[in-house]
Design a protein with these regions (language model features):
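Active-site- and interface-proximal helix/loop "cap" or "latch" segments in soluble metabolic
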Residues: 22-30, 34-96
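Structured beta-strand/loop patches that form or line metal/cofactor-binding pockets in enzymes
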Residues: 1-36
Length: 96
């Protein structure tokens, strides 16, 4: 029900680039992720609370995807059943 939908997934020069449409339950509408192996190289949200999504992206850069999943899974926003951080964890889970 809350799973993000993979829009694209490709590998260029060893960097995996994937885009996901987020659940309608959250303010962001898309997450773009770059992975180098199992490490997050960068990520960017489209829409959402700009300061918060920038903060999430900055904190996650350089982290192992599994560690981000462990920290962000299940975070809820306004009793919606998911959140922008949870959507990232769900998207990363699809990539691992």
């Amino acid at each position: 029900m809350f799973e993000p939908i993979k829009l694209s997934d490709s590998i260029e020069d060893g960097i995996r680039k994937a885009s996901f449409k987020t659940s309608d339950a959250v303010c962001s509408i898309q997450i773009d992720i770059e992975l180098e192996g199992d490490t997050i190289r960068s990520l960017q949200y489209t829409k959402g609370c700009h300061g918060n999504t920038q903060g999430i992206a900055s904190l996650c850069a350089g982290m192992k995807a599994a560690d981000v999943i462990a920290r962000l899974s299940g975070i809820d926003c306004k009793a919606r059943g998911t959140s922008c951080p949870d959507q990232l964890a769900r998207a990363l889970r699809q990539l691992l």
